[in-house]
Curated annotation (Swiss-Prot):
This is ATP synthase subunit beta, chloroplastic. Gene3D superfamilies: Bovine Mitochondrial F1-atpase, Atp Synthase Beta Chain, Chain D, domain 3 (1.10.1140.10), P-loop containing nucleotide triphosphate hydrolases (3.40.50.300). Produces ATP from ADP in the presence of a proton gradient across the membrane. The catalytic sites are hosted primarily by the beta subunits. CDD domains: ATP-synt_F1_beta_C, F1-ATPase_beta_CD. ATP binds at G72, G73, A74, G75, V76, G77, K78, T79. PROSITE patterns: ATPASE_ALPHA_BETA. Its EC number is 7.1.2.2. It comes from Microlepia platyphylla. InterPro entries: AAA+_ATPase (IPR003593), ATP-synt_VA_C (IPR055190), ATP_synth_F1_bsu (IPR005722), ATPase_a/bsu_AS (IPR020003), ATPase_alpha/beta_chains (IPR050053), ATPase_F1/V1/A1_a/bsu_nucl-bd (IPR000194), ATPase_F1/V1_b/a_C (IPR024034), P-loop_NTPase (IPR027417).
Length: 395
């Protein structure tokens, strides 16, 4: 079953509801195995998709109607980040969303459902006004179900795109579990695994799922996918195969998570095909490049600092380090979905505000502020206010 009746409901791989409000009344049924749209039907317009998350918007901007991957090892914040994106985008974005839980924890699926009910993305009183359809094939399901649940979610999204001609958001958590399920099925079929024990058909399976997630002239599908990175190794076949299909990659770093900088997005590892001056504009591009250059220089100097100490650096390098430490902290921001844990209200920072903030740090306009003032704030005005508060406390 596809269509408006699936909104606000949780379905399994077969499209059967697994929540309480009874059967899904839908006259339209689509098969989950469908071919990708023809090349001539694809839409090639390039525009930026604002998320309200500073580090993503500035350094690896997302493409409207593109595919975005959130890469990270265990426990660095992929699910929190994808939940925050669902929260920011599903609320601000007028269209509908489809969220596919592929082989992840049932608890996370339940948390997401409860959160959506609280934020009224799922309207319990009038279920037809909900903005999201949930499709779950979690860890406890057999491998066949986990392998196919991504296709079920794609099919639901395709209905909204092709029949209703809407802009759709498709969230998938987690692509690696789809690959693992394929590997289990492959072993059961007696296929010989190549290196690392993945299935020999890995590229084909990934392609058949990813090629369907695209934007046509009828409507767009913007897809955000969490990708678990086994043992923090980005060259593992599963994340490596996935990244070939993506427009933007947001890489989460264990080092930043250990420093307490959340979202722990690595500014030097994250990439985007949209980071071009003719797409994002000169101002945005120059600022992003400046930020990356400063952080790269800081990274090069870290060995010298570790061995000889800060005092051995030249005046210019010391200034670079001071600014880089501010730039490293400024991308951290409080999340709406983490309010219950942190106690600080979430922040949505618009792209112009983000650019303005980094433009003030780079040339040294904010050299007088302590680096703690840039930690877990929204825009640059909040950092200035926090610095003033810290000064009062110090006195």
């Amino acid at each position: 079953p596809v269509g408006e009746t699936t909104l606000g409901r949780i379905s399994n791989v077969l499209g059967e509801p697994v929540d309480n409000p009874g059967p899904v009344q839908s006259n339209t049924i689509f098969p989950i195995h469908r071919s990708a749209p023809a090349f001539t039907q694809l839409d090639t317009k390039l525009s930026i998709f604002e998320t309200g998350i500073k580090v993503a918007d500035l350094l690896a901007p997302y493409r409207r109607g593109g595919k975005i991957g959130l890469f990270g090892g265990a426990g660095v914040g992929k699910t929190v980040l994808i939940t925050e994106l669902i929260n920011n985008i599903a609320k601000a974005h007028g269209g509908v969303s489809v969220s596919g839980g592929v082989g992840e924890r049932t608890r996370e699926g339940n948390d997401l459902y409860m959160e959506m009910k609280e934020s009224k993305v799922i309207n319990e009183q009038n279920i037809s006004e909900s903005k999201v359809a949930l499709v779950y094939g979690q860890m406890n399901e057999p491998p066949g179900a986990r392998m196919r649940v991504g296709s079920t979610a794609s099919t639901m999204a395709e209905y909204f795109r092709d029949v209703n001609k809407q802009d759709v958001l498709l969230f998938i958590d987690n692509i690696l579990r789809f690959v693992q399920a394929g590997s289990e099925v492959s072993a059961l079929l007696g296929r010989m695994p190549p290196a690392v024990g993945y299935q020999p058909t890995l590229g084909t399976e990934m392609g058949s799922l990813q090629e369907r997630i695209t934007s046509t002239k009828e409507g767009s599908t913007t897809s955000i996918q969490a990708v678990y990175v086994p043992a923090d190794d980005l060259t593992d076949p599963a994340p490596a195969t996935t990244s070939a299909h993506l427009d933007a990659t947001t890489v989460l770093s264990r080092g930043l998570a250990a420093k307490g900088i959340y979202p722990a997005v690595d500014p030097l590892d994250s990439t985007s095909t949209m980071s071009q001056p003719w797409i994002v504009g000169e101002e945005h591009y120059e600022t992003a490049q400046g930020v990356k250059q400063t952080l790269q220089r800081y990274k090069e100097l870290q060995d010298i600092i570790a061995i000889l100490g800060l005092d051995e650096l030249s005046e210019e390098d010391r200034l670079t380090v001071a600014r880089a430490r501010k730039i490293e902290r400024f991308p951290s921001q409080p999340f709406f979905v983490a309010e219950v844990f942190t106690g600080s209200p979430g922040k949505y920072v618009s792209l112009p505000e983000t650019i303005k903030g980094f433009q003030m740090i780079l040339p040294g306009e904010l050299d007088s502020l302590p680096e703690q003032a840039f930690y877990l704030v929204g825009n640059v005005d909040e950092a200035t206010a926090k610095a003033a508060a810290l000064q009062v406390e110090g006195q």
